[in-house]
Amino acid sequence: MLRSLVGSEMCIRDSIRTAGILYGYGTREELAQAGADLICRTPEEFTKIMLSEQQGDKRMNATERKIAEDLLSIRAVFFRPDEPFTWASGIKSPVYCDNRLILTAPDVRTEVETAIMQTIEREYPQAEVLMGTSTAGIAHAAIVGHMMKLPMGYVRGSSKDHGRQNQIEGRLEKGQKVVVVEDLVSTGGSVLDVVKVLRAAGAEVLGVVSIFTYGMKKGLERLAAAKVRNVSLTNFDVIAQVAAEQKYIKPEDVARLLQFRNDPSDESWIGGTN
């Protein structure tokens, strides 16, 4: 169990780790009795540990590989390092991601939704409600909610300008334990906006499950600072490695892709320059 103590409120969430992390009030003995193996005295210490957890074990597991293979096979993720795409922000990227294509590929869709369900059952067994991000996470939250027989809803990017002016669609009671379902995490901004809305509504956000993460430092740091845990089915490093193994890209391109991942604003990876 991974535990965080803030003031007198104990929040417990499951983790594959067997260590407890607490910070807040109380003597070291009191905190240890509460189940902590590691005690942090400041939010900064806690954030550092959370960041370490977000980075996680770099070894590829079977699910990461399978989902990577699936996304590559339907071109939901594909690489073009010699002819980079341009994001809306102006950043040039060697990768294009469109996880909406998952919905049009029934076999892959089944693999992905089953993996999301298994991840929630393993990492967030206390989940009471699934909330999709608008719009990419809505379908996945709905399908998995049906599979798990859990209520689902979604969070709009902004409140409606008519009717009840809801930003949260679906019934959500204060104190309910929520898992956010997202398709893609890059800098973390959009999913953190959703978490903020849910917390303001009184929900206890257990964490996020996403299909794919870039693993960008900025995103990891922002999630850790907000004390939000994200568990992704696969990640940029795994997809780059699998893409090279299956000859979607050249083996020498992997280093360039990771250079982009480490600092998207640095365009020295383009054309193989250093």
Residue spans for each PLM region:
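Single conserved hydrophobic/aromatic residue that forms the stacking wall/gate
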Residues: 1-7, 12
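Short beta-strand/loop segments at the ligand-binding rim of alpha/beta enzyme cores
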Residues: 14-19, 204
